[in-house]
């Protein structure tokens, strides 16, 4: 479920009620909450901050939710069709991530949703079963 937040300071200071959220989600088709705060920056660049809470934790980068957010922003006129949007996530948990998203509007439909970014290897190992 995409939850728009007007002010990025509010998003940064969000105290997520995990137990209440789990109860709400049980009666919903949504699986998680993706909090999104889009803001226009200089030169009309659209950037957003996001937070994704799940199972008592927080994800530093959620590409699948970022793609849905791109579609949502285009559908609701926040982002223009094919406009690249930078989504920053994971800042509050000291694992900052940047994802670049865009989506195309085709009449009333949103299509061609794209998510990209860079990744770094955090761990390498072998598991023996």
Task: Please give the residue ranges for each predicted region.
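Active-site proximal loop and beta-alpha junction motif in alpha/beta enzyme cores
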Residues: 1-129
